[in-house]
């Protein structure tokens, strides 16, 4: 060092002197706030307070920050208990390696419930009153928002929701959520909240054992429904609301005298009017700020979500691809009374496992940008509609998703008129996409809904070891047009590829069972499929089928049992190019005339499969023929049979 200084002093003596003077000043100066330190707070601190980067803050009795703006980076906080240490505070910078509780931010765990009568006004003739318990308590919105701000930009934090914390529902439709931005390695656990979470650009986040509820205890509610007709002058809806003193501004009904605003938008658009249905909005909303990275590795485990519009939602903006999330894990959670979807995904590499749901409109939505998602052991009852995979029009980025070991029961408990109801809706996908349905059970029981079957519109689907039970008694098509009652089918189709050529799907069915309960007539069992390969498939029940295959380009079925008496195996006019397979049994309705369309080469197929009712021919009468008129006799008719066909 002496050599270096000597050489430097010989070349730049003035500069060396200045540097040495500056170093001496720093060494001799007293400690300042820019140095990392252990800070003990033993009094009430207000105003703005800057904590040296990397410092540790501890608290003594009576010590806290109040109405304070606190700044600092990588600050560690040791609260020394659960009392309030941040009272109405805001934060700038970041905190790390700290463990706190909700009450440290001034939240008061006094939420309880009182009996209440909840009134739903969802239309001119729909009024429902439910006896419920309404939550009440201290409004902890500001305190919990402060907790979220503390977590933002933080690293390795643990937050305990140590109690039940009430928050007033924001009736103007804001997210009403604890907002956390750009945090990493944060764990939040326990307790009950009326406020959900909104995470932007967060990484390695864990939520454990949290209950997120709505304004009231869980109870069945009528889905809010509207269409454009209700806003037309003179409509029943228009007369109803105007007679009650409301006017419509294009978005909601407003009472000028009271200021009450009632928005009847349903499903995607329910933003305002949450108080009308007693719901909170998303329990967990996960996305990305365009200026930061996507949210990744979010774990939600052992949580319960009730009376919300949505449960867990990963958000994506189609116009900004970096607004995506990835690697979401939702396990051991329960969802009930969810207005729309417990699971709504716009993200990739998701794992949903061991979850249950009840009274939900649609249990699982793998929507735009949802790909490589596994939903395993998800059991849902009282669903309005079945799960789906879907994309924005023109996009191919929802692909390679799977439902495994799941069960979905679709009933009339949640019903909206004029809506198409699918057991499963799978749409879009890439050219190499394969949607998988494995070891699942579906049931559809309705006297109201327009059953649309399994709508599979992706490029390829594999369905294995699954069962589908269909009980449709009073079909939508008859209810809409009484003039055709008794003529229209209960079910238009069971499996439908839907698309026009050449976008129709390739579908593989292996060990799949379709059971018709109260359903009496199916028009087409398999409809508009490019290539259908079926092995060990059973179609059985109480009904009949007009056709088993219609507009299915190539059919290869083996060891299947088609037990519904049909009028045709392949519909007349179908564009089927080939039908192959062996070891199948087809039951055929008496009086059926043409089982295959003209021109389809089906001789080998007819030879290698058993086609007919499997009923034995009636025994011949031993009695002598009798005649009703002289010279004419009545002879018992003999059934037309062959070695393979039995009518």
Show which residues each predicted segment covers:
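Short linear proline/tyrosine/threonine-rich motifs used for host-factor recruitment
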Residues: 248, 253-255, 261
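Right-handed parallel beta-helix/beta-solenoid
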Residues: 36-37, 93-142
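Short glycine/acidic-rich loop motifs that flank beta-strands on beta-rich extracellular proteins
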Residues: 62, 67-70, 74, 155-157, ...
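N-terminal extracellular ligand-recognition/capping segment immediately after the signal peptide
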Residues: 37-70, 135-186, 190-198, 519-520
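Surface-exposed loop/turn motifs in large extracellular/passenger domains
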Residues: 153-157, 179-187, 199-209, 214, ...
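Sequence/structural signature of small/polar-enriched beta-strand/turn repeats
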Residues: 52, 61-98, 102-111
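N-terminal secretory signal peptides that target proteins for export/translocation
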Residues: 1-13
